[in-house]
Amino acid sequence: MDTLTDRQREILELIRRSVAERGYPPTRAEICQSLGFRSPNAAESHLRALARKGAIEMRRGASRGIRLTDAFAGAAPEPSPATDDPNAGLPVVGRVAAGSPLLAEESIERYCQVDASLFSPPADYLLRVRGESMRDAGILDGDLLAVRRDTEARDGQIVVVRLHDEVTVKFLERCNGVLRLIPAHPDYPVIEVAADGQDAVLEGIGVGVLRSPLDPRGPEGNAASD
């Protein structure tokens, strides 16, 4: 494994801290601001060096398309459920505080005794849906959407996206540098954001849906809005 320079270690630690505290990596602009680079090109050069040394993986065309590899992620645990019990089941994410990771302790309503491997790929958590914007895809108000945490998705997949301080569930489509978040209901508008901007952060992909009587709906079900 190649040795990292002091500057590369600083960037790696910044990425670790961002993932641990916010649930997603920094943008190039944020790296520049934090470490005093004059140009995003300087940050890009160091990121490419980190990728060559196996410390990170980079996804082209995404401002936050940086992922720590397993060998270097140890010092930056991702936000974890509020229990260490492996038999607790999948966390049910309800009300999400502005600026908090989805799996922050205060966002978890409870745990649902569902085997993650029932879904393909296996789910990491259940997100309580609010609203009818995905009605025609069979995702109703109060349903629990099984979500696989990921920073990449294909066109046509159901995705969980953070828009500023809101979390939404939509179909994904890319077109000419624009991310189109498409509802499955004729009364709701398509949301468009720049693919390389900071307005939208992909939190995961939908891999299944649960509804009553397996998991009763509660009064606080308002995680994913229209």
From Swiss-Prot:
Residues 28-48 bind DNA. It comes from the Bacteria. It is an enzyme of class 3 (hydrolase). The record marks 98-99 as: Cleavage. Keywords: Autocatalytic cleavage, DNA damage, DNA repair, DNA replication, DNA-binding, Hydrolase, Repressor, SOS response, Transcription, Transcription regulation. The active site is at residues 133, 170. GO terms for molecular function: DNA binding; serine-type endopeptidase activity. InterPro entries: LexA (IPR006200), LexA-like (IPR039418), LexA/Signal_pep-like_sf (IPR036286), LexA_DNA-bd_dom (IPR006199), LexA_repressor (IPR050077), Peptidase_S24_LexA (IPR006197), Peptidase_S24_S26A/B/C (IPR015927), WH-like_DNA-bd_sf (IPR036388). Its EC number is 3.4.21.88. It catalyses: Hydrolysis of Ala-|-Gly bond in repressor LexA. One of its GO terms (biological process) is DNA repair. NCBIfam families: lexA. Represses a number of genes involved in the response to DNA damage (SOS response), including recA and lexA. In the presence of single-stranded DNA, RecA interacts with LexA causing an autocatalytic cleavage which disrupts the DNA-binding part of LexA, leading to derepression of the SOS regulon and eventually DNA repair. Homodimer. Belongs to the peptidase S24 family. This is LexA repressor. It comes from Halorhodospira halophila (strain DSM 244 / SL1). The gene is lexA.
